[in-house]
């Protein structure tokens, strides 16, 4: 494969975003589904973690919730990839949305410490459905936009994700403070219904499903498509490395635990008359909002430079790793909420670059007939990384290690994937 093929994309700008949304009705509907469901998700995630920390008082409960939100995606990823490469991905997304709506409504039954156990199986069920939805969404983008607009669409999706994080964190804190957690759960459930409606209205051709034989239950235990997918990935040198890039984002798992504990104990908002529990929720919201600002600016500012060439995308990923490392290292020595927020912004500025550009590389390198399996593997490996790093963060905090030390160590650990990726870039240059 050409080590630095030109992508030939259009310029990335606000006018280009507007052109894509106005001129491509299918992408506009997929984007609308993303907006409503992700804002609801950020409401929901804050509420779940706040609920667990309030009822149990243990960082480990938050870490366990994080593991259950991500680890099942690793286990079900191969089956999800096969299904997404055999069935219409539009139908997969609709079923996943409707199932998640019912699951989130069920969270309303968690009213006391005695039934807090219900959170965990519900999180597992929701995560299993998400494992089918996300690879399907990533896989359909090349089917609904022109080749030269793929990077533009990915950048817009990332920018939207970041805006949704900012909006969801801000509104989630406000809604929870004013109306309570139940309102947050209801709004998130309805957001999945709205997302399913948007996707239902999409009309596009799915080449992988044309003429495909019917899917049977036995196909889910037939590992030959998975083996074929592994062989395909191994045969593509750059794809073989790119599929592990997101897993190197080691700040994501610990970040969720750190934001929850820091928001509760270190940086809770203490306005006059504000209930302490709701002040803790607002502290979490501010840190999460800072993450959204950084994740928004990262791809937005670097995509116009990097988007034209694969080589630049690869170099930007290396610098993204370093930015994430610097941000969390500095977070470990922050003593005020505003300082912590700036550090989080820097870290996720870099982390978002890694996410967006690795997604573009995977779409660029993979054939449509394998793309579902490629993105399922990508998501599964990434989720395994989140689960492991988040669990370790929770264990260390519960054993008395300060949150600042955990943050600092997380930043230092980010140097490892940066060095591995740097070595890979040098190796490819020598092989070219």
Feature roles, as predicted:
Residues 26, 42, 115, 119, ...:
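Residue-level signature of transmembrane alpha-helical entry/exit and packing/kink sites
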Residues 139, 143, 185-217, 422-432:
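Helix-loop junctions on the cytosolic side of multi-pass membrane transporters
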Residues 2-28, 205-244:
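Juxtamembrane intracellular "pre-TM" segments in multi-pass secondary transporters
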Residues 28-46, 66-84, 88-103, 118-177, ...:
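Substrate-agnostic recognition of the 12-TM MFS/MFS-like secondary transporter fold
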Residues 44, 53, 106-110, 126, ...:
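MFS-fold secondary transporters
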Residues 46-56, 107-113, 167-187, 261-270, ...:
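Transmembrane alpha-helix termini and helix-breaking/packing motifs in multi-pass membrane transporters
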Residues 44-47, 51, 56-63, 155, ...:
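Small-residue hotspots at the loop-to-helix junctions and early N-terminal turns
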Residues 2, 75-78, 86, 92, ...:
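C-terminal transmembrane bundle of multi-pass solute transporters/carriers
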């Amino acid at each position: 494969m050409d080590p630095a093929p030109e992508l030939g994309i259009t310029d990335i700008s606000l006018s280009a975003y507007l052109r894509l949304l106005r001129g491509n009705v299918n992408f506009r509907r997929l984007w609308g589904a993303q907006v409503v469901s992700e804002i609801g998700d950020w409401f929901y995630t804050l509420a779940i973690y706040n609920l667990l920390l309030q009822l149990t008082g243990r960082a480990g409960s938050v870490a366990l919730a994080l593991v259950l939100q991500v680890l099942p995606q690793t286990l079900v990823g191969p089956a999800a990839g096969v299904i997404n490469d055999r069935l219409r991905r539009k139908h997969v997304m609709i079923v996943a949305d409707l199932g998640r709506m019912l699951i989130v409504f069920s969270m309303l039954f968690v009213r006391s410490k005695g039934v807090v156990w219900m959170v965990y199986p519900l999180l597992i069920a929701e995560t299993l459905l998400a494992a089918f939805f996300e690879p399907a969404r990533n896989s359909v983008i090349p089917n609904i936009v022109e080749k030269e607009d793929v990077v533009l669409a990915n950048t817009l999706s990332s920018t939207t994700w970041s805006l949704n994080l900012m909006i969801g964190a801000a509104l989630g804190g406000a809604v929870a403070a004013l109306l309570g957690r139940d309102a947050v759960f209801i709004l998130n459930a309805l957001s999945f219904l709205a997302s399913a409606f948007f996707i239902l209205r999409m009309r596009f051709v799915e080449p992988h499903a044309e003429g495909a034989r019917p899917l049977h239950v036995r196909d889910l235990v037939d590992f030959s498509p998975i083996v074929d997918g592994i062989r395909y990935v191994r045969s593509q040198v750059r794809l073989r490395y790119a599929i592990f890039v997101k897993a190197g984002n080691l700040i994501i798992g610990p970040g969720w635990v750190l934001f929850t504990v820091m928001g509760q104990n270190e940086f809770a908002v203490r306005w006059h008359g504000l209930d302490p529990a709701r002040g803790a929720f607002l502290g979490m919201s501010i840190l999460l909002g800072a993450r959204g600002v950084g994740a928004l600016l990262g791809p937005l500012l670097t995509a116009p430079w990097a988007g034209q060439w694969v080589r630049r995308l690869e170099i930007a990923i290396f610098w993204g790793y370093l930015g994430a490392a610097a941000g969390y290292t500095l977070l470990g020595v922050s003593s005020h909420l505003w300082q912590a927020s700036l550090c989080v912004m820097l870290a996720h500025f870099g982390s978002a670059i890694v996410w967006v550009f690795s997604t573009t590389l995977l779409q660029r390198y993979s054939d449509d007939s394998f793309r579902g399996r490629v993105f399922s593997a990508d998501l599964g490996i990434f989720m395994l990384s989140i689960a492991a790093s988040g669990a370790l963060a929770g264990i260390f905090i519960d054993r008395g290690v300060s949150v600042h030390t955990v943050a600092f160590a997380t930043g230092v650990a980010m140097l490892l994937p940066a060095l591995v990726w740097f070595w890979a870039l040098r190796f490819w240059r020598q092989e070219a």
